[in-house]
Swiss-Prot record:
Component of the 30S ribosomal translation pre-initiation complex which assembles on the 30S ribosome in the order IF-2 and IF-3, IF-1 and N-formylmethionyl-tRNA(fMet); mRNA recruitment can occur at any time during PIC assembly. One of the essential components for the initiation of protein synthesis. Stabilizes the binding of IF-2 and IF-3 on the 30S subunit to which N-formylmethionyl-tRNA(fMet) subsequently binds. Helps modulate mRNA selection, yielding the 30S pre-initiation complex (PIC). Upon addition of the 50S ribosomal subunit IF-1, IF-2 and IF-3 are released leaving the mature 70S translation initiation complex. Gene3D superfamilies: Nucleic acid-binding proteins. It is found in: Cytoplasm. Residues 1-72 form the S1-like domain. Belongs to the IF-1 family. GO terms for molecular function: ribosome binding; rRNA binding; translation initiation factor activity. This is Translation initiation factor IF-1. It comes from Protochlamydia amoebophila (strain UWE25). InterPro entries: NA-bd_OB-fold (IPR012340), RNA-binding_domain_S1_IF1 (IPR006196), TIF_IF1 (IPR004368).
Amino acid sequence: MAKEDTIKIEGSVEELLPNMHFRVSLQNGLNVIAHLCGKMRMKNIRVLVGDVVTVEMSPYDLSKARIIFRQR
């Protein structure tokens, strides 16, 4: 899958789950399970409940996502 095929959408973190996973509520009303991307883990960027984040999703599985940016 090419990087251009991904879907980027904003949402807010609703719940912290074990093992660096988060329940994110998207703008369109869907809830997805998301994990941090590798660069955010390396830079120790903290994500808390209520943070607005940008997630990247595959068009093949719309129930999982990757957090790629945390709004300031």
